[in-house]
C-alpha cells in the first residue's frame, strides 16, 4: 500500500519495480507441498468466521460459506477498513454524473448499444436489471433450472469481496445487505443457465440485484427451505430501510462480474484438491492389497523425472507403504518365491505417481488461478479515484475460470481413469494375485458375484467422466449483436466440472469399499491358509510318519513339500471345497506324494515302505478333517476371534479402513447377506459429500514430514 488519497480511497502502488508482472507472486503461491496446502484448506474451511477485505479470500472460505452444513455456524464479516474506499468510488460516480461526465453504463447504453445516452442514471440501472432478468426457472426453487443454493451463496460471497476493493462505484450499505442475506441463510434464486461470462455473469447476478431492488419476480429460499418474496427475504435477513433504489453504476457493479463462475469453481476445487490426495492414498492401499512391489515409489526414479507433482505423489505412496505389514509380507514372498508373480507390477499400480502427478499440478494451478480471480476486480468500468477517471476495459472476461475449469475437469477424468484401471485389476482374479473373482467373500462362489455390478457401475461412471473431460471453452458463440464476440463460458465449464467431481466421488467411494473388501479377503485368506497348513501338517504327521509296524516311513519327508504347496497355492482357488479333486490343492498335494514315490526307487516294491500306499490314507484323513477346519477358521473370523489378526491395523492406511468399517458400519459383502454393494457405497459417498472422510484421510498421512525417504 502506498498510502491513502484525500478522498479516502486506498492508493495502490501497482507499478512496483519488484515483480511488476505478478509471475513471482504466482510462483511463490506454489511453494510447499500440495498436502500441506490441502491441510491448510481444510483448516480454513472449518473456521467460524470469514473476514472479507477484498484481497485474501480463499477457495476454502468460499466452499465453507457455500456448504449447506455450515450455514448456521460460519459467518461473514466485512472489513470496516474497506468502507472508505467503497464510499469514495461511489461518491466519485455521483460527482462525475453531476458534472456531466460521460461514463459507460452510467450515462450510456450497454454493450453494442452504448452509443445511446441518458441523464437518468437511476432509471438506466433499473432497466439494466429488468432486461437481464432473462433466466428460465421452471417450477420450484430447486428445480433443475435453478442454480443450487450453495452456488448462489458462493457467488454472493465472491461478489462482495470484489466490490469491497472500492473500484466499482457501489454503496457499502448494499454489500452489508448481501452479507446479512448470507448470514441469515436467505438465498436468492438464480437461473442455472443463461450466462456466457463475457461481460460477467450478467443474467444470474441480475437476480441478486432484483432481490435487493424488490423486483416482483424475485424469489429467495429461506432458512427452512421456504420460498420468500423480496419483502419477506429482507425481513428474515434483518435488512432494514426498504429496497434499494440503485444509483448510477450500482446495477452494473452488481452484475458485471465473474462471481457465479468463480464461486462455483472455488467449491469444485476445494473438493478436487481433497480428491487428488485421496487418489494418492487409494493407490497406495491398492499396492498393499495387490501384494505390490514398493520400489515403484523409490525417490530416485521420480527425482530423475523432475516433476514436483509426481515426486510428491510417489513420496506420499512411499510413506503409506513404508513399514506396511502387507508390504513386509509381500517382500518376504517375493524373496522366497520370485516366480509367483510378474517381475513388474502393471501400469495402473507401477506408474500411478507418474499418472497422478501432472493431474495434481493442474488442479493446484487451477486453484491458484481461481484464488487470484476471486480476489480480483472484474467489472467495467473501473473507478480510479486517485487519477480521477473511469477505466473502460474487460476484466469481466472470465477466461481464467473457463480455462482452469476445463483443465481441472480433464485432470479429474484422468484420476478417474486410473481409479477404474486399478478397480478392474482388483476384481479380476487373473490379475489380483490370489483374491477371488469379483472379490466374492461368500462360501459358495456360484451364488456370490461380489462386485460384478459395481464394476459395471464403475465403467459407467468412468465413461461419463471421460465424456465430461471434453472442453467447454472451444464452443464459444458470438453474442450480444457481436459485441461479445469472444466469451469465456466459465459457468458452463464450472458446472461440468462440478458434475465431474460428483462422479469422481462416486468412483472413489465405490473403490474404497472394494479396497476394504480386499483387505478383509486378505485377512480371510491368511486365516484359511493357516488352518489348511496346520491341518495338512497334522494329517501328514499322523499318516505319513510311521509304517504299519511302527517304523519310520520314507513318506515322512514329504511334509515340507506339502506345506510349500499350501503356501504357494491361492487360497480362494479351493476355499469353497478344499478337498475337491477338481481344485488345485488336492491335485498338487497328491503330486508331491507321487513325486516322492517315484524317487523312492526300490522301496516302492515293499508294501511297508511304499509311499504310493500312503496316498489314499493321507487323502482320506485330510478329507475327513480339512473341510471342518476351514469352516471353523472362517467362522472364528466372522465372530471376531480369528487366529491371525488383520494386518491392516499395522498399516498407515488403517484410518480409512476403520472409518468405513467402524464409523460408517459398512460391512464385508457376501452373497449370504441381504445387503447390496450399492448400500455400502452409498454410506461412503454420503460421508465423502459431507466432508466426514477428510479427517481419516489426513490421519493416514499425519506422520509424513513432507519429504521422500532418503536414497540409500
From Swiss-Prot:
Keywords associated with the record: Cytoplasm, Lyase, Phenylalanine catabolism, Phenylpropanoid metabolism
One term of GO molecular function: ammonia-lyase activity
InterPro entries: Aromatic_Lyase, Fumarase/histidase_N, L-Aspartase-like, Phe/His_NH3-lyase_AS, Phe_NH3-lyase, Phe_NH3-lyase_shielding_dom_sf
Residues annotated as catalytic: 104
PTM: Contains an active site 4-methylidene-imidazol-5-one (MIO), which is formed autocatalytically by cyclization and dehydration of residues Ala-Ser-Gly.
Annotated (E)-cinnamate binding sites: 256, 344, 350, 380, 452, 480, 483
Annotated crosslink 5-imidazolinone (Ala-Gly) location: 198-200
Modified residues (2,3-didehydroalanine (Ser)): 199
Any one of the GO CC terms: cytoplasm
EC number annotated for this UniProt entry: 4.3.1.24
Pathway: Phenylpropanoid metabolism; trans-cinnamate biosynthesis; trans-cinnamate from L-phenylalanine: step 1/1
Pfam families from the UniProt entry: Lyase_aromatic (PF00221)
Catalytic activity: L-phenylalanine = (E)-cinnamate + NH4(+)
GO terms, biological process: cinnamic acid biosynthetic process; L-phenylalanine catabolic process
Subcellular location: Cytoplasm
Superkingdom to which the source organism belongs: Eukaryota
Family in the record: Belongs to the PAL/histidase family.
Quaternary state and interactors: Homotetramer.
Role noted for this protein: This is a key enzyme of plant metabolism catalyzing the first reaction in the biosynthesis from L-phenylalanine of a wide variety of natural products based on the phenylpropane skeleton.
Name the record gives this protein: Phenylalanine ammonia-lyase
Organism: Nicotiana tabacum
Amino acid at each position: 500500500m502506498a498510502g491513502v488519497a484525500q478522498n479516502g480511497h486506498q492508493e495502490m502502488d501497482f507499478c512496483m519495480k519488484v515483480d511488476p508482472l505478478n509471475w513471482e507472486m504466482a510462483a511463490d503461491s506454489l511453494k510447499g507441498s500440495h498436502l500441506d496446502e490441502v491441510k491448510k484448506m481444510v483448516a480454513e474451511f472449518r473456521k467460524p468466521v470469514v473476514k472479507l477485505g477484498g484481497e485474501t479470500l480463499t477457495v476454502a472460505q468460499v466452499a465453507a460459506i457455500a456448504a449447506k452444513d455450515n450455514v448456521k455456524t460460519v459467518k461473514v464479516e466485512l472489513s470496516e477498513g474497506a468502507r472508505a474506499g467503497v464510499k469514495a468510488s461511489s461518491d466519485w460516480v455521483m460527482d462525475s454524473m453531476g458534472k456531466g461526465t460521460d461514463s459507460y453504463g452510467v450515462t450510456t447504453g450497454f454493450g453494442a448499444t452504448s452509443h445511446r445516452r441518458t441523464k437518468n442514471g437511476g432509471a438506466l440501472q433499473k432497466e439494466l436489471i429488468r432486461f437481464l432478468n432473462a433466466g428460465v426457472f421452471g417450477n420450484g426453487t430447486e428445480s433443475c433450472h435453478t442454480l443450487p443454493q450453495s452456488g448462489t451463496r458462493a457467488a454472493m460471497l465472491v461478489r462482495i469481496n470484489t466490490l469491497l476493493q472500492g473500484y466499482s462505484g457501489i454503496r457499502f450499505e448494499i454489500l452489508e445487505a448481501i452479507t446479512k442475506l448470507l448470514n441469515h441463510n436467505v438465498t436468492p434464486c438464480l437461473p442455472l443457465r443463461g450466462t456466457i461470462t463475457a461481460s460477467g455473469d450478467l443474467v444470474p447476478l441480475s437476480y441478486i440485484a432484483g432481490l435487493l431492488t424488490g423486483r416482483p419476480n424475485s424469489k429467495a429460499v429461506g432458512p427452512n427451505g421456504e420460498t420468500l418474496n423480496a419483502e419477506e427475504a429482507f425481513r428474515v435477513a434483518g435488512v432494514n430501510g426498504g429496497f434499494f433504489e440503485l444509483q448510477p453504476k450500482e446495477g452494473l457493479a452488481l452484475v458485471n462480474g465473474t462471481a457465479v463462475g468463480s464461486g462455483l469453481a472455488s467449491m469444485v476445487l476445494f473438493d478436487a484438491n481433497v480428491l487428488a490426495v485421496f487418489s494418492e492414498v487409494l493407490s497406495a492401499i491398492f499396492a498393499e492389497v495387490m501384494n505390490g512391489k514398493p520400489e515403484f515409489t523409490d525417490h530416485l526414479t521420480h527425482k530423475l523425472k523432475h516433476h514436483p507433482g509426481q515426486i510428491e505423489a510417489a513420496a506420499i505412496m512411499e510413506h503409506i507403504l513404508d513399514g506396511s505389514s502387507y508390504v513386509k509380507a509381500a517382500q518376504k514372498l517375493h524373496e522366497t518365491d520370485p516366480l509367483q508373480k510378474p517381475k513388474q507390477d502393471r501400469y495402473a499400480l507401477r506408474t500411478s505417481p507418474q499418472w497422478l502427478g501432472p493431474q495434481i499440478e493442474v488442479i493446484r494451478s487451477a486453484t491458484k488461478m481461481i484464488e487470484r480471480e476471486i480476489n480480483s476486480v472484474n467489472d467495467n468500468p473501473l473507478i480510479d479515484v486517485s487519477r480521477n477517471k473511469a477505466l473502460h476495459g474487460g476484466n469481466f472476461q472470465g477466461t481464467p475460470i473457463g480455462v482452469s475449469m476445463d483443465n481441472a475437469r480433464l485432470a479429474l477424468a484422468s484420476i478417474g481413469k486410473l481409479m477404474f484401471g486399478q478397480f478392474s485389476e482388483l476384481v479380476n482374479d487373473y490379475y489380483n494375485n490370489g483374491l477371488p473373482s469379483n472379490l466374492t467373500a461368500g462360501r459358495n462362489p456360484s451364488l456370490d458375484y461380489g462386485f460384478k455390478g459395481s464394476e459395471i457401475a464403475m465403467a459407467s461412471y468412468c465413461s461419463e467422466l471421460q465424456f465430461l473431460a471434453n472442453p467447454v471453452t472451444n464452443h464459444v458463440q458470438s453474442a450480444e449483436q457481436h459485441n461479445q464476440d469472444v466469451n469465456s463460458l466459465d459457468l458452463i465449464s464450472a458446472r461440468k466440472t462440478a458434475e465431474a467431481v460428483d462422479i469422481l466421488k462416486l468412483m472413489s467411494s465405490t473403490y474404497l469399499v472394494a479396497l476394504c473388501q480386499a483387505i478383509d479377503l486378505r485377512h480371510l485368506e491368511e486365516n484359511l491358509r493357516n488352518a489348511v497348513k496346520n491341518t495338512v501338517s497334522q494329517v501328514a504327521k499322523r499318516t505319513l510318519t510311521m509304517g504299519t509296524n511302527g517304523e519310520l516311513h520314507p513318506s515322512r519327508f514329504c511334509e515340507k513339500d506339502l506345506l510349500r504347496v499350501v503356501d504357494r497355492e491361492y487360497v480362494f482357488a479351493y476355499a469353497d471345497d478344499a478337498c475337491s479333486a477338481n481344485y488345485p490343492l488336492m491335485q498338487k498335494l497328491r503330486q508331491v506324494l507321487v513325486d516322492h514315490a517315484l524317487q523312492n526307487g526300490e522301496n516302492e516294491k515293499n508294501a511297508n515302505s511304499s509311499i504310493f500306499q500312503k496316498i489314499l490314507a493321507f487323502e482320506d484323513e485330510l478329507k475327513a478333517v480339512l473341510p471342518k477346519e476351514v469352516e471353523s477358521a472362517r467362522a472364528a473370523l466372522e465372530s471376531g476371534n480369528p487366529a491371525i489378526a488383520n494386518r491392516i491395523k499395522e498399516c498407515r492406511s488403517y484410518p480409512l479402513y476403520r472409518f468405513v468399517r467402524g464409523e460408517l458400519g459398512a460391512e464385508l459383502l457376501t452373497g449370504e447377506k441381504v445387503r447390496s454393494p450399492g448400500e455400502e457405497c452409498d454410506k461412503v459417498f454420503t460421508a465423502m459429500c459431507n466432508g466426514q472422510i477428510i479427517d481419516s484421510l489426513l490421519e493416514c498421512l499425519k506422520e509424513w514430514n513432507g519429504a521422500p525417504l532418503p536414497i540409500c
